[in-house]
A protein has these predicted regions:
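Cystatin/cathelin-like cysteine-protease inhibitor module
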Residues: 19-128
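Sec-dependent bacterial lipoprotein signal peptides
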Residues: 1-19
Length: 128
């Protein structure tokens, strides 16, 4: 009986931690987009995927994503990233959101955002 109670308590604590990280990742992405989208677009968030770790992204891929995303017309060109936040394992989340320009034209975008393990910095993002 004690084992079952221990396992249930541990599962509950892990679930709460996971929910907290998911919320933190969503907030980080929203803050990042609010800072780095051009001001002539209104952004509304549709959905987010689950937060997932990956060890498949290296510094060259990060640099390539940053360069590619800086060419998009709705993204500011002078995004400041923290290179010290790039570690062997990153966390990623996919976000789908709608941009509405001044004329009312909507564009739905899905992008993947890569973050450090502490969920303090977006280190890169890419178009899906």
């Amino acid at each position: 009986m004690k084992k079952i109670l221990y396992v249930l308590t541990l599962s509950f604590v892990l679930a709460l931690t996971s929910c907290g990280d998911q919320y933190k990742a969503k907030s980080l992405v929203k803050d990042f987009l609010n800072e780095n989208l051009t001001t002539d677009n209104d952004c509304s968030y549709e959905r987010f995927s689950n937060l997932t770790p990956t060890a498949m992204i290296d510094i060259d891929q990060v640099k390539s994503m940053r360069k590619e995303m800086s060419t998009l017309p709705y993204v500011k060109k002078d995004i400041s990233y923290n290179d010290n936040a790039i570690t062997d394992t990153l966390l990623y989340i996919r976000a789908t959101y709608k941009l509405t320009d001044k004329e009312g034209k909507q564009q739905e975008l899905t992008q993947t955002f890569y973050m450090d393990k502490a969920l303090t910095h977006v280190v890169a993002f890419k178009q899906n």
